[in-house]
Amino acid sequence: MLFPAFSILLISFFSLLSVVTTKTQYWCHGDGVLNNQHTCRFFTIVIDAGSTGTRLHLYKFIHDPAIASHGMPFKVEKEIFQEVKPGLSSFAKSPSSAADSLEPLLQRARKEVPHFMWEKTPITLKATAGLRLLPGDMADDILESVEERIFNSGFFAAFPDAVNVMPGSDEGVYSWFTLNILLETLFTDEPTVGHKPAAHRSVAAFDLGGGSTQLTYWPNNEAVFSEHVGYERDIDFFGHHIRLFTHSFLGNGLIAARLNILQLETDNEIESTHQLITSCMPEGYQLTEWEYALKFWNINGSSSHSFESCYGTTKNFVESSEIMHLRELKGSPVYLFSYFFDRALNSGLVKGNEGGKIELRQFKEAAEIACRREKTEIDDGSHWMPWQCLDLTYIYSLLRDGYQFEDNQPLVLAKKIKGMEVSWGQGLAFATANEFQLTEGAIKTALSSEPNSTVVDQIFDLVYSGTNQVLSYFNIISV
């Protein structure tokens, strides 16, 4: 009679042991310490506090020692995305409300990450142009409230600058890494491609946010750095030196550009009453209580409404900004995302999240169609429809008159690649994961020739060296 009971007990013991073993082996920190001798997984949380909304990027990484020698020591297996609106800058008068706005995102992260992994999951929040444009005290008050919420989230946030305002140039660098990692232009698991990154295989990244726009690429001809001093970022990527050309143009984001263009068309006396007039909207149309940078505006259409008039003002604004001519990229496909993609999607230039290839002239053609619409046609309830003429005209002028691409310039519009968002989030996730590994002990990889070395140098981490602002990997150090 004791044998059946003993059998049940033995089966239960081995079932429990199997669960514990699976938990330990599946997660890199399954038993509370780092286990990296087998394929394992871990999470990193990045919160993008943009000018128009706050976005959760929850990345599930997989580390596979068997393929580490073919490229990345770990890579993103899955991304979970969620967005809340408005952006943090909208809570300038109530910083605590800014912190409260994060709660749906934190709750989603807590739901997706197993509880025993919370303290082993690094979290970071980076604010962008929306907070950069606020007066210093307001931005600081919001960040202080948000930082407290992040630090009490249950996730790991005990490293420097876990919550801060990200420099625009960092957005560009991280976006470039995300794009090229997803496209596998830097490293790939295919041995026939080769593991040495090369400029000619990489692609240029153009990001259009609400307050700023960024461009980043790896030039084949380094003479461009002499022509545009201060736009260089030197990095060491997996032991390979890369000189990136990158810059962020504050005030040239889509929403900021709207206000700048409208102000060019409006007399100062009228503007002082918070009224703006634009030829980018039809006569008789009024958009009331439009908010930007803590101010409200009433916008009125004009009798001179046309693509030609709208383009004339937009071109003046673009040419007065610091956007530069990029000769090397002429004729080569460049990747555009964020608002570039959104407005192309609204106009039917691309279908769905997969994006597609177009030529620059198609933005002009879409703008001409949008600028012919009458008052009744643009008042359909879509938040973007009244702005479509101006937005498309600005995008065309930015690329044509700013970067001076020809109308036949090939453009690749992207929102997701391999089911993951094209943004700076994934690039930052690698850096954040590295900071955490420095704290916990780095994942080992066959990439190093030293048997006792780690991959501290294999996972990029933003480290600024002197005035050159060098983005580098840590050199290999012994355990």
Curated annotation (Swiss-Prot):
**Induction profile:** By stress such as high temperature or ethanol.
**Localization (cell):** Endomembrane system
Give residue spans on the Cytoplasmic membrane side. Answer: 1-7
- Could you tell me how activity relates to pH for this protein? Optimum pH is 8.0 for UDP and 7.5 for GDP.
Q: Does the keyword Metal-binding apply?
A: yes
| Glycosylation sites per record | 300, 452
Keywords assigned by UniProt, alphabetized? Calcium, Glycoprotein, Hydrolase, Magnesium, Membrane, Metal-binding, Signal-anchor, Stress response, Transmembrane, Transmembrane helix
Q: Which CDD domains match?
A: ASKHA_NBD_NTPDase5-like
Q: Which cofactor does it need?
A: Ca(2+); Mg(2+); Mn(2+)
This chain's protein is named: Nucleoside-diphosphatase uda-1
What organism is recorded for this protein? Caenorhabditis elegans
Tell me the organism's taxonomic lineage.
Answer: Eukaryota, Metazoa, Ecdysozoa, Nematoda, Chromadorea
